[in-house]
Design a protein with these regions (language model features):
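Extracytosolic ligand-binding ectodomains
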Residues: 1-368
């Protein structure tokens, strides 16, 4: 009698930011590679395949695009878990659906409000932690009086700013001016806002936002003939995607999670090249989705029955898993009431954009 054939496990990938070379084309490939490695070493009893749905999420489209993508992966493709979406806005747009449809979604969003029984997070940046990292860096450079340009109205810009206010209190800094720009500002509006901030004569400039404004930040500074020391949130990560984005924010420092000192990431990139003959871009887009794929693979290996609910329960058993994202001390731990996985003081770092590339800054976070 012929034995029944096993079906591969199906895992969804939500790509809500298509069109970013060095990122959009890395996420699915990195997640699939983690699943492939798990099968090859015998962690999984069968292959796992990714099904990717590209869609234009916020701030380019609206929340319906992400909701439709999640619904398609759950109802039509019947996946066991989902990697993505990427951004805070789109993750919050699907949160109620994630909780009602009970298919776990592991996002890389930074908000503190993506919370639920089936909502998991390996954040590529963090809207609460980043402001404290930035404030500590500013203090280490001897800065006191800080000007802020932020996305507004914007959930990301507003949450960043709220926690930056807390951080300035902790690190004894003063916000002396705040300028609001739309998440996708014009050169004219950026020039006007930065001109007003220049008049406050700050020690340094901070950008708090999603990152589409990076296309105009240096234009606005150039038009005002103003080049203060400046730092931004994890909007900076796009500088590691492609030379084009690095050149847009030349001279800026920013929060990132790509760290050359983490040899686990370098080893993973080498294995991928040896296996496929292709290369993954060394950045936190690649590393975070490999980590997501790795976590899903472990959960698939531990689930007691093959259902999305069982995958969610199995994710909560992951403890002290060394990450390829972040520095050497970064690890992943989940628990029943702890779905924000990255841990360790070096899960974030600061880099600077120079000459079409980026360099790791020597700053190390200290809470005092």
């Amino acid at each position: 009698m012929e034995q029944n054939k096993t079906e591969p496990y199906k895992i969804g990938v939500m790509m809500d930011m298509p069109g970013f070379p060095g990122a959009s084309d890395m996420f699915g490939a990195a997640a699939q590679f983690a699943l492939d490695e798990a099968f090859e070493i015998g962690l999984l009893d069968r292959p796992a395949v990714t099904i990717q749905v590209d869609h234009l999420g916020q701030p380019y489209g609206d929340g319906y695009h992400s909701r439709n993508a999640y619904r398609q992966l759950v109802e039509e493709d019947q996946v066991l878990a989902i990697a993505g979406p990427l951004t805070t806005d789109n993750s919050l747009a699907i949160l109620e659906m994630v909780e009602s449809m009970k298919v776990p979604a592991i996002t890389i969003c930074g908000t503190q409000d993506y919370v639920g029984k089936y909502a998991f997070n390996l954040s590529n940046g963090n809207l609460a932690d980043e402001p404290h990292y930035i404030a500590a860096w500013l203090k280490s450079r001897g800065h006191k009086r800080i000007a802020v340009v932020r996305d507004y109205p914007s959930r990301i810009g507003m949450e960043f700013h709220r926690f930056f206010e807390y951080a300035t209190q902790q690190f004894d800094l003063e916000i002396i001016g705040v300028g609001n720009v739309y998440p996708a500002p014009t050169e004219e509006s950026m020039t006007e806002v930065l001109g007003r901030l220049k008049q406050t004569d700050p020690d340094a400039l901070v950008y708090l936002g999603f990152g589409e404004a990076c296309r105009e930040l240096n234009n606005g500074l150039r038009n005002n003939d103003w080049w203060p020391e400046r730092i931004m949130t994890s909007a900076f990560v796009q500088a590691t995607y492609h030379e084009f984005f690095a050149e847009l924010i030349d001279g800026w420092y920013g929060i990132d999670q790509f760290n050359e000192r983490n040899t686990r990431f370098a080893d993973m990139l080498k294995r991928y090249h040896q296996k496929t003959g292709r290369s993954l871009t060394p950045n936190s887009a690649t590393s975070s989705f490999y980590d997501i794929g790795h976590c899903i693979a472990i959960a698939l290996s531990r689930m007691e029955i093959a259902t999305p609910e069982a995958v969610a329960s199995a994710l909560e058993t992951i403890r002290l898993l060394p990450a390829v994202t972040g520095g050497p001390g970064t690890y992943i731990t989940f628990g029943p009431h702890d779905h924000r996985g990255f841990k360790g003081l070096d899960y974030l770092n600061i880099r600077v954009s120079k000459n079409g590339g980026t360099e790791l800054d020597s700053f190390e976070f200290s809470a005092g």
